[in-house]
C-alpha cells in the first residue's frame, strides 16, 4: 500500500482494510488521529466527523485522570465514557502511546462504534 502524505488518512485506510466490524469498514463509523503527548491534535483521518471532538476530549480526560508518569510502551488506554465523548457507550476510544527512545511523544487514537460491548442481560 502506498502511503499518503497524511498519517491520519493512512491510519483510516489501514483500519478500514483490517477491521472485522462491518460498522467500521462499511459505514465508516470511526475516526482516527495522532495527538501530542499533551493531547493536542496533530492529524485526523476523517471517518465520522462527530468523533473528532470526542476523541480529543477523551484523550485529555485520560491524561488528566491518570497522568503520563506510568504510561509505558505497549500500554493502551481504553474508555467508553459517554459523558466525556458526548455520545453513547458503544463508542470506544483507544489511545496508544508513541515513544521515541524512552520519551512519550504522542498518541495514536481511534474512536469507533463497537456493535456489542456486553451487558448484564442479553439483548439489553
Task: Tell where the protein language model's regions lie, with residue ranges.
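Long, charge-dense accessory insertions within large macromolecular proteins
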Residues: 1-56
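Short alpha-helix boundary/capping segments
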Residues: 47-50, 90, 123-124
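FAD-binding core of FAD-dependent oxidoreductases
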Residues: 50-53, 93, 109
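Mobile "lid/hinge" segments at catalytic clefts and subdomain interfaces of large enzymes
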Residues: 101-124
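Conserved mixed alpha/beta core segments that line enzyme active sites in large multi-domain catalysts
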Residues: 13-14, 18-21, 40-42, 56-97
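Acidic-enriched, low-complexity/disordered segments with a strong bias for Aspartate over Glutamate
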Residues: 6, 10, 29, 75, ...
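Acidic, glycine-rich active-site loops and adjacent beta-strand->loop/helix elements
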Residues: 48, 81-85, 111-116
Amino acid at each position: 500500500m502506498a502511503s499518503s502524505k497524511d498519517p491520519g488518512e493512512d491510519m483510516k485506510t489501514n483500519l478500514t482494510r483490517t477491521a472485522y466490524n462491518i460498522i467500521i469498514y462499511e459505514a465508516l463509523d470511526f475516526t482516527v488521529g495522532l495527538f501530542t503527548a499533551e493531547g493536542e491534535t496533530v492529524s485526523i483521518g476523517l471517518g465520522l466527523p462527530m468523533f473528532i471532538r470526542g476523541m480529543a476530549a477523551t484523550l485529555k480526560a485520560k491524561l488528566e485522570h491518570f497522568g503520563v508518569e506510568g504510561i509505558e510502551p505497549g500500554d493502551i488506554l481504553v474508555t467508553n465514557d459517554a459523558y466525556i465523548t458526548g455520545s453513547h457507550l458503544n463508542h470506544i476510544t483507544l489511545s496508544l502511546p508513541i515513544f521515541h527512545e524512552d520519551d512519550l511523544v504522542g498518541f495514536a487514537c481511534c474512536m469507533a462504534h463497537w456493535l456489542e460491548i456486553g451487558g448484564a442481560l442479553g439483548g439489553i
